[in-house]
């Protein structure tokens, strides 16, 4: 288990320096840049770097951490932490293991044949499709970060898959709440939807587009990979005992 006493670390409350550290160790398309940036700098608290690892702390309505590398500094303030490529077992410092999710991303471009996406504005219909086909979706109508809902249809004209294009407070563009109607699964509609959102994000000026998906959702991961998205990181969420998101 990592222990901040085992290795010396540097820390900073300077966001620009912190993102520089992240880029040096993790590359341009990385988790930290999706969650914190100059656009939501007021949420950034502190970052920590060791010889081989990086971690940071931010305010998400609770004290939220991210940790990357084999020996990251653990901030004792963390109530929840996402650990990349976790090998730490059931406990991570004072936190306990909860669940796993993966992040994917792509440099946007307009994809020939997928230049447009149909906008969906019927919020009652959107909620119905989510409730019936993806009830654990993180984004529902009314979320202020939504830029638009989009859909694709089958040959009969029926809606087959929906999703939301979202811009987080960090400025990151993200696809959220992708739901394929159960009878239409396995036919490539989620891949088509993703390609159309990649084009749309490019048209809106986004350089990159990301998404999060449950580590167990193999079918969805394959759909995103077929659309050209690459894995950024596999995360394990750790929670402070008794923690409940506000």
Where are these regions (language model features)?
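Conserved beta-strand-loop-alpha-helix junction that forms the acyl-donor binding cleft
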Residues: 84-89, 211-221, 237-245
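Conserved catalytic-core motifs of GNAT/GCN5-like acyltransferases
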Residues: 95-107, 230-245
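Conserved acetyl-CoA-binding loop-helix of GNAT-fold acetyltransferases
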Residues: 71-78, 180, 186-203, 221-226
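A conserved beta-strand-loop-helix scaffold within acyl/acetyltransferase catalytic domains
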Residues: 138-149, 153-156, 160-181
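N-terminal charged segments
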Residues: 1-89, 127-129
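Short, high-confidence coil segments that cap the C-terminus of an alpha-helix
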Residues: 52, 206-208
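Conserved N-terminal entry element of GNAT/NAT acetyltransferase domains
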Residues: 1-13, 96-121
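Eukaryotic intrinsically disordered, low-complexity regions
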Residues: 114-151, 176
């Amino acid at each position: 288990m990592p222990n901040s006493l085992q290795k010396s670390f540097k820390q900073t409350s300077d966001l620009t320096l912190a993102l520089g550290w992240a880029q040096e160790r993790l590359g341009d398309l990385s988790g930290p840049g999706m969650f914190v940036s100059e656009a939501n700098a007021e949420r950034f608290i502190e970052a920590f770097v060791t010889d081989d690892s990086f971690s940071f702390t931010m305010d998400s309505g609770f004290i939220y951490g991210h940790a990357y590398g084999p020996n990251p500094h653990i901030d004792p303030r963390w109530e929840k932490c996402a650990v990349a490529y976790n090998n730490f077992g059931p406990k991570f410092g004072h936190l306990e293991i909860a669940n796993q999710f993966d992040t994917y991303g792509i440099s946007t471009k307009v994809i020939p044949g997928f230049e447009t996406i149909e906008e969906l504005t019927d919020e009652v219909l959107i909620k119905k499709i989510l409730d019936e086909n993806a009830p654990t979706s993180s984004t529902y109508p009314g979320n202020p970060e939504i830029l638009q809902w989009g859909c694709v249809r089958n040959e009969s004209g029926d809606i087959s898959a929906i999703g939301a294009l979202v811009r987080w407070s960090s400025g990151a563009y993200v696809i959220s709440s992708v739901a394929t109607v159960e009878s239409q699964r396995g036919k490539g509609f989620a891949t088509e939807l993703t390609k159309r959102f990649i084009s749309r994000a490019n048209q809106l000026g986004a350089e990159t587009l990301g998404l999060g998906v449950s580590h167990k959702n193999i079918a969805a991961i394959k759909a995103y990979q077929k659309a050209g998205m690459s894995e950024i990181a596999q995360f394990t969420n750790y929670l402070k005992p008794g923690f409940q998101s506000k």
